[in-house]
Amino acid sequence: MFPKIMNDENFFKKAAAHGEEPPLTPQNEHQRSGLRFARRVRLPRAVGLAGMFLPIASTLVSHPPPGWWWLVLVGWAFVWPHLAWQIASRAVDPLSREIYNLKTDAVLAGMWVGVMGVNVLPSTAMLMIMCLNLMGAGGPRLFVAGLVLMVVSCLVTLELTGITVSFNSAPLEWWLSLPIIVIYPLLFGWVSYQTATKLAEHKRRLQVMSTRDGMTGVYNRRHWETMLRNEFDNCRRHNRDATLLIIDIDHFKSINDTWGHDVGDEAIVALTRQLQITLRGSDVIGRFGGDEFAVIMSGTPAESAITAMLRVHEGLNTLRLPNTPQVTLRISVGVAPLNPQMSHYREWLKSADLALYKAKKAGRNRTEVAA
């Protein structure tokens, strides 16, 4: 039974399992990023070093070294990859620690190249593994630093041990080296693919978070206004129709005060769903904040927009909120068709806002068109 080694990754996993979130501080995020980096390096290191055990062992058999070299080889190939992970995962700064581990890999690799007498094929396999790891983890800067460490380590080993340089590889050494030469690049490519896929998904999520309203899933105001500006410019350029709607839930403050904010949130989500069900997929829905929504209906005259909103009104008449079926949602809508005389998209927005004010002043639960 091995003792459970407590580290920060265990802490984050334990907190998630109990429904707790660790404090979101820059330090914690840096630490978690470092742990993810160390975990990505762990598998390639373990496979690469284990795969080099037989090629190195075959060269040692041809000129037997002292017995302790075999212990060092076993420890390097099968213990060091897991020890390096534990060192990095328990470090205050896992990223810096793992970079140090990679440099240690380079030093040890250079040592083994020297011990093998620079035997050409096993040394080439070792060089390939180290170069891929260094370049993939730290780019050209870490690659050059690691390469220098390997060369220096190899030269020092040759000098201290007095081993004769022999570039020739026996057939056995060729056959034992070929599998790792073929397999390791495939493994490295697979790990890189997995990392790229996760990064792309992370980027997509960040993009959604930056453009969508968290409660309803429709566009937030900042992104929606960007789309409105683009639509305004395109319609003016191509002389195309478009209609802008601003929608407000009637007596929303009263709903909040009477039934609570949870019911208010239900009302906002219910209106969002009704708009999504009733309007076209090409209509751009955005939440302005609170209970106010806006819709861009591209290629649509005001009459068609009014007809669509009549269907929304009818749908809301039969809609009941799950926890408060006695509440009936009513909305006021301001409709503003694009006017060629408008010089800025904010004039269009103001026109729809004035139409909304007109609908509220006329008694609410209605749709009004800008004059």
Curated annotation (Swiss-Prot):
TM annotation in the entry: 46-66, 68-88, 112-132, 143-163, 171-191
Its membrane topology: Multi-pass membrane protein
Enzyme class, broadest EC rank: transferase
Co-factor binding comment: Binds 1 Mg(2+) ion per monomer.
Site (Transition state stabilizer): 253
Domain named GGDEF: residues: 240-371
Binding site for Mg(2+): 248-249, 291
UniProt record, GO biological process: cell adhesion involved in single-species biofilm formation; negative regulation of bacterial-type flagellum-dependent cell motility; positive regulation of cellulose biosynthetic process
Cofactor: Mg(2+)
Subcellular location(s) per record: Cell inner membrane
Alphabetical UniProt keywords: Cell inner membrane, Cell membrane, GTP-binding, Magnesium, Membrane, Metal-binding, Nucleotide-binding, Transferase, Transmembrane, Transmembrane helix
GO cellular component: plasma membrane
Residues involved in substrate binding: 256, 265
Cited function: A probable diguanylate cyclase. The last member of a cascade of expressed proteins, its expression requires DgcM. DgcC production induces biosynthesis of cellulose in some E.coli isolates, but not in K12 strains. Cyclic-di-GMP is a second messenger which controls cell surface-associated traits in bacteria.
Protein name per UniProt: Probable diguanylate cyclase DgcC
Native organism: Escherichia coli (strain K12)
